[in-house]
């Protein structure tokens, strides 16, 4: 029954919130170093690419010819306040830069304080046909419908952030199917705009200095991203032309002991 399912779902959500709430209270080790690393990488993004991608990124930045400082907007798919805590540390202890503005992160799935948004991307991802065709489960389990019903404008704000960005960085994301609308939003924006799409995934490939292997790894990362974003094969070439992979976990690589 739908009511039983939703009750079980609420229990899972509440237990997850309790667990994450406890984790969120734990101290963050070397927070000043983390804040400094984020800032350093944002200013030195070009140096994190392999040579072909570095040249491409440098040409992109030169062609944009933007005056003024760097403004960073963050769409977080996380529930915790970890990033906010690190950014606060950056503002207070890391030497501030007048030309760098990092706006407060927007949590597309909610926070521990205002509630966790959990569920699927659309009705096709609800396997049970009775649930899928009913009223209760779709309205409380399809994430875009929940945001729309809440009417706080968060989806609109995130779309504007994506469409107005010069550089879009995908970091620390699974690129899962339950958020397909956002990956397709990014793919569509990149396909029709003059944007660079930087992709940093957790890289398990063995370090190498061989040029042929580096080229293969970069191409495979682009292909992996297109597949995860559910980009139609006919559009892969367009996405490839805008995508700049960062290999070997160079971006925001934090040397923290387990």
Question: Where are each of the predicted segments found?
Answer:
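Short, surface-exposed, polar/charged, turn-prone segments marking secondary-structure boundaries
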Residues: 101-102, 133-137, 172, 196-198
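Active-site periphery "cap/insert" segments of enzyme catalytic domains
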Residues: 1-110, 155, 159-164, 177-189, ...
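Flexible internal linker/loop segments at domain or repeat junctions
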Residues: 106-109, 114-160
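SIR2/sirtuin-family catalytic core signature
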Residues: 154-258
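N-terminal start-of-chain detector that recognizes signal peptides
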Residues: 78, 140-142, 169-172
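Short, flexible coil/linker elements and helix-boundary hinge sites characteristic
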Residues: 21-27, 39, 50, 91, ...
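Conserved active-site beta-strand-loop modules that form the wall/rim of enzyme catalytic pockets
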Residues: 104, 116, 166-169
């Amino acid at each position: 029954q739908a009511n039983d399912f939703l009750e079980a779902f609420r229990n899972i959500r509440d237990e997850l919130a309790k667990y994450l709430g406890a984790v969120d209270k734990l101290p963050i080790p070397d927070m000043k170093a983390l804040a400094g690393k984020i800032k350093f990488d944002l200013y030195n993004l070009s140096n994190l690419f392999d040579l072909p991608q570095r040249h491409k990124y440098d040409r992109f930045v030169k062609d944009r010819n933007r005056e003024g400082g760097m403004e960073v907007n963050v769409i977080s798919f996380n529930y915790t306040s970890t990033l906010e805590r690190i950014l606060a540390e950056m503002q207070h202890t890391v030497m501030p830069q007048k030309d760098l503005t990092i706006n407060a992160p927007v949590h597309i799935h909610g926070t521990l304080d205002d509630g966790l948004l959990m569920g699927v991307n659309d009705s096709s991802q609800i396997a049970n046909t009775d649930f899928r065709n009913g009223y209760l489960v779709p309205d409380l389990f399809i994430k875009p419908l929940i945001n729309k019903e809440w009417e706080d404008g968060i989806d609109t704000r995130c779309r504007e952030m994506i469409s107005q960005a010069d550089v879009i960085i995908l970091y620390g994301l699974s690129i899962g199917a339950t958020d397909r609308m956002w990956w397709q939003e990014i793919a569509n924006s990149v396909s029709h705009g003059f944007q660079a799409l930087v992709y940093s995934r957790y890289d398990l490939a063995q370090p190498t200095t061989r040029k042929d292997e580096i080229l293969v790894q970069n191409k495979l990362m682009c292909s992996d991203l297109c597949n995860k974003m559910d980009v139609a094969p006919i559009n892969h070439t367009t996405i490839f032309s805008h995508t700049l992979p960062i290999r070997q976990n160079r971006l925001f690589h934090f040397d923290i002991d387990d």
